[in-house]
C-alpha cells in the first residue's frame, strides 16, 4: 500500500496534529499551501501557512538507502514575513513530520526541486519525539512527532538555528535525559525557553499517554470516553511531593476533572468516590446546587481501575493528596 497521501489527507494530518498538541485550528484556506488559525480555548491564537509534501525515499539505484526527501512540486514555497510559514514533509511510515528552514528554500524551483533528510532522523523522532539533523548545506532540519506540531510552529525560527546554538538545542535529541539543571545551564534566554517548553510538553504528554492508556481512555468516575478525558495528577503538580508516575495519575472527564480540582469530588483509599458535603453546602448557600442529583447519579460507587494492578492509584498518594487538597468530606 502506498504511503503517499493527497493534499486533502495531508491537511487532515496537520489538523489532527494541532489537536494532538492540545490546540484547535480553523482552516482559513484549504488549498495548498494551507492557511490555518491555531488557537487555544478562547484566545485568538496565531495564523500559520503550511507547505507540506510526502517524505519518501524516491527510489533509484543512485540514491542512498537512508536518504529520504520531499519534492517541491505544484507550488513554489515562499516565505511570508507577516505569518509563520512552515515547510514540512510527512512520513506516514514513521508517523512524523520533518521541517526545513523556509528562509533557505523560499523561491526554490528547478526541474526536480527536492530537500533531503536521513532515515535515521525520522526514526529518532519516531522513538524520541524530536530530532535535529544538520544537512550537508549546513541547514538544520527538525523531525518531530505530531503532538509537538504547535511547539514547532511557535518556535521554528529558534529551532533552526545552527552554530553556537547547536549545543543548547541538541538537548532535544534526548529529551529523557534533560534535567532541570541542564535547562538552567542554557545561557541564551530564547533557547532556554524553547527547550524548557518542549521538555515540559514531552513529560506531560508521556504522563498523559500512560495514564489514559491505563484506563482505556475512560473516565474513572463515570466511564465516559468520547475523547473528553484528561490525565489528572492525584497529588497536584504544584506540590513538591507530586510525581509523574502512572500511580499518581487518574483518568477523568472534563467535568469530573474540574470537580476533582475544586474539591467537590475525591476518592478514598478504598477507591470509593466521595462528594464533599462541605463544598455542596457552599454551593447551596450560593444558590448554585442545581443539577447535583443528576451529577451524583452519573458517578460510579468506586472508580474504574486499570487492568494492570501496577497502574492502580497508590493509596499513599491518595492519602497525601487529600491532605494537600485539604479534603473536608
Per-segment meaning from a language model:
Residues 78-102:
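Elongated alpha-helical scaffolds
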Residues 44-76, 80-83:
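A broadly used, surface-exposed interaction patch
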Residues 1-43:
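N-terminal "first-domain core" detector
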Residues 202-206, 214, 224-228, 234-329:
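A detector for short metal-coordination/catalytic motifs
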Residues 82-83, 123-151, 301-329:
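A short, charged
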Residues 17, 25-27, 96-172:
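Polybasic, proline/glycine-rich intrinsically disordered low-complexity segments
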Residues 178-218, 237-247:
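Short, charged surface segments at domain edges that flank catalytic/cofactor-binding sites
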Residues 55-58, 92-95, 257-259:
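Short, charged/polar surface micro-motifs in flexible loops or helix N-caps
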Amino acid at each position: 500500500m502506498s504511503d503517499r497521501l493527497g493534499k486533502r489527507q495531508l491537511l487532515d494530518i496537520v489538523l489532527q496534529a494541532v489537536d494532538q498538541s492540545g490546540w484547535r485550528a480553523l482552516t482559513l484556506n484549504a488549498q495548498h499551501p494551507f492557511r490555518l488559525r491555531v488557537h487555544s480555548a478562547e484566545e485568538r491564537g496565531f495564523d500559520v501557512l503550511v507547505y507540506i509534501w510526502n517524505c519518501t525515499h524516491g527510489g533509484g539505484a543512485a540514491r542512498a538507502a537512508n536518504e529520504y526527501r520531499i519534492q517541491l512540486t505544484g507550488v513554489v514555497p515562499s516565505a511570508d514575513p507577516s505569518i509563520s510559514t512552515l515547510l514540512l514533509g510527512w512520513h506516514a511510515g514513521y508517523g512524523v513530520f520533518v521541517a526545513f528552514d523556509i528562509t533557505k528554500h523560499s523561491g526554490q524551483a528547478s526541474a526536480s526541486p527536492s530537500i533531503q533528510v536521513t532515515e535515521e532522523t525520522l526514526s529518532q523522532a519516531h522513538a524520541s519525539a524530536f530530532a535535529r539533523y544538520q544537512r550537508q548545506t549546513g541547514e538544520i532540519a527538525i523531525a518531530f512527532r505530531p503532538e509537538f506540531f504547535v511547539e514547532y510552529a511557535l518556535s521554528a525560527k529558534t529551532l533552526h538555528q545552527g552554530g553556537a546554538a547547536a549545543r543548547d538545542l541538541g538537548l532535544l535529541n534526548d529529551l529523557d535525559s534533560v534535567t532541570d539543571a541542564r535547562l538552567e545551564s542554557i545561557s541564551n534566554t530564547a533557547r532556554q525557553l524553547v527547550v524548557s517548553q518542549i521538555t515540559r510538553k514531552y513529560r506531560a504528554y508521556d504522563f498523559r499517554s500512560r495514564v489514559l492508556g491505563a484506563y482505556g481512555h475512560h473516565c474513572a468516575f463515570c466511564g465516559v470516553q468520547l475523547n473528553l478525558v484528561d490525565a489528572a495528577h492525584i497529588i497536584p503538580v504544584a506540590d513538591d511531593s507530586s510525581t509523574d508516575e502512572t500511580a499518581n495519575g487518574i483518568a477523568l472527564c472534563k467535568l469530573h476533572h474540574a470537580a476533582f480540582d475544586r474539591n467537590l469530588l475525591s476518592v478514598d483509599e478504598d477507591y470509593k468516590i466521595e462528594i464533599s458535603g462541605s463544598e455542596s453546602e457552599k454551593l447551596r448557600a450560593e444558590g448554585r446546587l442545581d443539577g447535583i442529583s443528576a451529577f451524583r447519579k452519573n458517578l460510579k460507587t468506586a472508580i474504574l481501575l486499570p487492568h494492570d494492578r501496577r497502574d492502580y492509584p497508590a493509596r499513599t498518594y491518595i492519602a497525601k493528596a487529600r491532605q494537600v487538597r485539604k479534603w473536608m468530606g
